[in-house]
């Protein structure tokens, strides 16, 4: 092989390794605010990314209770808590009288618990690439929405 081809391969490996390494969600220092809270996660038994998100919560200091439910039961939990369907994700977390829908970064949870807004919860819709518990690279800023009484109140924050 010629030197240019070998150099190209080496640079490619370094480049893709750097993307993989730097995209990993860094663990924040455990927040004492989180250690006193019980996060209750509703998820289906077959969801692998939910398991990764639960590990993320635990690594950030949360005490986590997992409730595995059927798809229908999970949908009912979302409906009973008036989470708009267009903001749904694969799991729902309840903590401190709020719901947290989706693969939410701890920065948003910290803001929610610190500011204590008069809302029912926050949502990061769908399952964005690179969000906590999800594989891939972050393709765009995460838009997190406030919800009250079944209504999307707009942007809570962007990360």
For the regions a protein language model found, what residue spans apply to each?
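Stable alpha-helical elements in mature extracytoplasmic
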Residues: 46, 53, 70-73, 105-109
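Positively charged n-region of N-terminal signal peptides that target proteins for export
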Residues: 1-4
């Amino acid at each position: 092989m010629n030197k240019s081809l070998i150099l190209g391969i080496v640079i490619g490996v370094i480049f893709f390794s750097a993307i993989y390494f730097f995209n990993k969600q860094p663990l924040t220092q455990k927040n004492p605010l989180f250690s006193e809270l019980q996060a209750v996660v509703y998820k289906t038994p077959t969801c692998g990314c939910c398991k990764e998100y639960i590990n993320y919560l635990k690594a950030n200091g949360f005490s986590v209770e997992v409730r595995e439910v059927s798809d229908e039961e999970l949908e009912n939990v979302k409906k009973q808590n008036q989470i708009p369907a267009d903001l749904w994700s694969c799991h729902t977390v309840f903590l401190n009288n709020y719901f947290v829908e989706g693969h939410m970064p701890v920065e948003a949870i910290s803001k929610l618990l610190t500011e204590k807004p008069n809302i029912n919860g926050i949502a990061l819709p769908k399952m964005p690439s690179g969000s906590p518990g999800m594989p891939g690279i972050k393709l765009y800023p995460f838009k997190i929405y406030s919800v009250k009484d079944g209504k999307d109140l707009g942007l809570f924050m962007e990360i």
